[in-house]
Amino acid sequence: TAVTDIVPDVVVAKDGSGNFTTVGAAVAAAKDSSTARFVIYIKEGAYFEYVDVDKKKTNLMFIGDGIGKTWIKGNRSVVDGWTTFRSSTVAVVGTGFIARGISFENYAGPSKHQAVALRSGADFSAFYQCSFVGYQDTLYVHSLRQFYSECDVYGTIDFIFGNAAAVLQKCNLYARKPNENQKNIFTAQGRDDPNQNTGISILNCKVAAAADLIPVLSSFKTYLGRPWKEYSRTVFLLSQMESLIDPAGWLEWSGDFALTTLYYREYKNTGPGSNTTARVTWPGYAVTTNETEVIQFTVGNFIQGSQWLTSYNIPVYLNLT
């Protein structure tokens, strides 16, 4: 469905031409525990506010004017006294949340440690053509089932992290220029029990350097992930990896912590960063060409996409391709 075909329930505009001038006011106006979709159209502009879609605010949809046009921005960080969890510019818990055409940013900067742009703990949440801009801990895929399609994610350290069941499909993941003596790590998945059906699935994505990193690529090492928790689970499937990825591919968290219990897989990736000949030799890591091993990480199997995503009117494929 084209954005123009979706009729919003309320409009947010900085210039007063809508129903509200802040996103937060529009969220507050949504009926609690709604089974019907409530659409908030957020007109182009930069909204400097912290937005909380709590568990009572179900089936909300944010529609913006596109990446780089509609911005929600904040700068909370751990250095400035917030917890990682509370540092998020936008936090979503209400089930059935959809965002489309919005840039979420935490502009605290690379010296402020953890500073989250968006945290999702919303089951059945989906993000289409959105961007997530930060440095350390940009995108907190906190918990439950979530889907990201045609999104751009920018960061430095552990910038896609958490313990959701998350699939990123056809997204662009960009490592930025960190501080001196810092490394870039795309993921830090937080599964702490082998029975949890959680993980980060990177499917048919581009793994690349952001514009500010390109001229200084040789000064910084960049890795696909590191194990935040003991049973960390992350897969890169059919993705295109630029040359920024260190030949080892993956980084330890602390000594040999989790190296036997983690589950990291690479499957049929392409590009100069996908060369696996010098990869780590941890017991929990493997390169696989076995489709039956990775089929569990598709939208259909990993997050049961056929039960909910197909009604969201956003492009999705349930299988590997």
Swiss-Prot record:
Enzyme class: hydrolase
Binding annotation for substrate: 84, 114, 226, 228
Documented EC number(s): 3.1.1.11
Annotated GO MF terms: pectinesterase activity
PROSITE patterns: PECTINESTERASE_2
Site-annotated residues for Not glycosylated: 19
Keyword Glycoprotein carried by entry: yes
Post-translational changes noted in the entry: The N-glycans attached at Asn-75, Asn-275, Asn-290 and Asn-319 are complex oligosaccharides containing xylose, fucose, hexose and N-acetylglucosamine.
PANTHER family: PECTINESTERASE
Protein name: Pectinesterase
Organism this protein belongs to: Actinidia deliciosa
